[in-house]
Amino acid sequence: MPSVDTASAILSSLDALGVTHVLYCPGSRSAPFAYALEAGSFGGDARPILDERGAGFAAVGLARTGALPASVVTSGTAVAELAPAVLEASHARLPLLVLSADRPGELRGVGASQATDQSGFFGTHVRASIDLEPQE
């Protein structure tokens, strides 16, 4: 399953870069991250959180303690639920990494279910926004 391999590679990279916590919000688009976490692709603390807003603010709290957290959410409106936490982290100059499992680019803007263009969604409140295309 290529998407699980990609999620594993991303999580392993986060681990190597010093990310300490992954707060995972379950969803069908982000399921490969759940499988990769279960397989041990991330060596830090990983925990499921059902509400994206809760995950965002839990990540902000962890960042305030000196941790380097990441929140993983699914597609559609889930990323919008992180906006208050992203703005809080931005204003407080706290590290917060957001991974959103969006639909492929060709499904955006054509009426596909749960396809919200997430690239650049947080505007100037983030240091970078990267859109990875799916791998074959």
What are these regions (language model features)?
Residues 2-136:
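N-terminal alpha/beta PP-like core and its mobile active-site loop of ThDP/TPP-dependent enzymes
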